[in-house]
Amino acid sequence: MEELEKTRKILKTSFFIAVVTVAVLFAFPYDLKPKEWEIYAGSYFITTLGLTVGGATIGILLGMMLAFFKFQKTKNEVVNMIKDIIIDEYVDIMRGTPMVLQLLILSVVIVIFNNYWIAVIALGLNSAAYVEETVRSGIESIDKGQMEAARATGMPYRMAMNEIIMPQAVKNILPALVNEFITLFKETSVVGYISVMDVTMNSKSLQAAYYSVKPILFTGIIYYISVKLFSFIGKRLEMRLKEND
């Protein structure tokens, strides 16, 4: 069984290398000038990756806060009901409307930031809705008896959540969080609608300048390799967490 798994990994890696090699040979934009390569690299590393990291940071922090507030109950039932309705509606609005539409609305509403930071905020607010649902399901997957036992020993609710429930929930939801990061990475391709020059928008400009589809095809390869890398890192983190159990 172990030998079969090793063979599968070798074949999978070989296939990936073969696909990328053939794709690069046919799609590599050899005609690009050094300055154009510099701009292209900046549109990927600074814009696309920058938007992804910024949006993911906002999304994870805000999403976890929303999930935490959803579970934290007060003695006032009316306050609890209003709080839950607000969080639920926020999640429904963000999940029920297109990312492009949210981006366009924020670009009109928020005028104190440039479009790059508006894109970061829009991506983060959208991601937070999905992270909240993911974290909520992760917390609900933990046996309720653990919280009850912690509370019975006199541990405050917040401490019990931070030290007992959340560490276990994070292990359960890590694959879903990695998938959300990958989804966010691909969703950055819509920021061109508010004139942010990400790698997709840049490749479209190069395609128009050179009358060639190669810049767009090459960008597709870049996305493919990036997603493979993110997935690999996510799996390694998951394995590391399991080893520490």
Sequence positions of predicted segments:
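Transmembrane alpha-helices and adjacent helix-loop boundaries
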Residues: 1-245
